[in-house]
Curated annotation (Swiss-Prot):
Its cofactor is Mg(2+). It holds the Pfam family MMR_HSR1. Residues 22-196 form the EngB-type G domain. This is Probable GTP-binding protein EngB. The gene is engB.
Length: 199
C-alpha cells in the first residue's frame, strides 16, 4: 500500500467533533496498550502520526487520520484498562458505541489482539458485536515478534477458538510493528474495501 500524504485531522471527544466527509473509514479497535497506534504508524510509514505510549489508556479520544484524500484511519480508545475512573470509562464507551453504531461510512474494522495472550472477555464482546453488525473485519494479532515460530500455530488456534472465529468470515493475520510482518495483509484488507466502497 503506497501512501503519500497521511495526516492527522482531529481528536474527537464528542460526536459533534467527528469530521464530515464521504470517504470510507477504517476503525482500529482493541484493548489498551495492544499496539493500535503502532500498527497505524507502520501501515502509513510514519513513526509518529498516531501517538504511542507505554502507558495504557493514553488514547482518550477517537483520532481521525486522512490518508491521501482517499480514506480515513480511525484510532479508537483502548478498552479494558482497569486504572481509569468509572465515569471516564463510561464516556469512552458512549463515544466508541456512538461511533460504531452511527457512522455510515465505516467500511471496515481492524480488531487488534495480543498474539502472546488469550483474548479477553472484552475482546470477545467486541468481536461478537462486529459479527452481528456485518461490517467487514480483519483480526490482527500484534507483537508476534515476541513469540517463537514454534508457538505461532498454537496461539493462532487459541485466538480463533476463544473468539469463535469458525463461524465468522472475517480475516486473520499476525502483525509486528517491529518487523513489518502483516503490513501487506492489513493494507490489502483496507484497499480492497476502498475499491468496493459506495458511500
Amino acid at each position: 500500500m503506497k501512501i503519500k500524504n497521511p495526516r492527522f485531522v482531529i481528536s474527537a471527544y464528542d460526536f459533534d467533533d467527528f469530521p464530515t466527509h464521504n470517504w470510507p473509514e477504517f476503525a482500529f479497535s482493541g484493548r489498551s496498550n495492544v499496539g493500535k497506534s503502532s500498527l497505524i504508524n507502520t501501515l502509513v510509514n510514519r513513526r509518529k502520526l498516531a501517538r504511542t505510549s507505554s502507558r495504557p489508556g493514553r488514547t482518550q479520544s477517537i483520532n481521525f487520520f486522512n490518508i491521501d484524500d482517499r480514506f480515513y484511519l480511525v484510532d479508537l480508545p483502548g478498552y479494558g484498562f482497569a486504572n481509569v475512573p468509572r465515569k471516564v470509562k463510561e464516556e469512552w464507551g458512549r463515544l466508541i458505541e456512538g461511533y460504531l453504531n452511527n457512522r455510515p461510512n465505516l467500511a471496515g474494522i481492524v480488531q487488534i489482539v495480543d498474539a502472546r495472550h488469550k483474548p479477553t472477555r472484552d475482546d470477545l464482546m467486541m468481536v461478537d458485536w462486529i459479527k452481528a453488525s456485518g461490517i467487514p473485519c480483519l483480526i490482527a494479532a500484534t507483537k508476534v515478534d515476541k513469540i517463537s515460530r514454534g508457538s505461532r500455530k498454537k496461539q493462532e488456534e487459541l485466538i480463533k477458538k476463544t473468539l469463535v472465529l469458525e463461524d465468522f468470515d472475517g480475516q486473520f493475520t499476525f502483525f509486528s510493528a517491529k518487523t513489518g510482518e502483516g503490513k501487506k495483509q492489513v493494507g490489502k484488507f483496507i484497499l480492497d474495501l476502498v475499491d468496493s466502497f459506495k458511500g
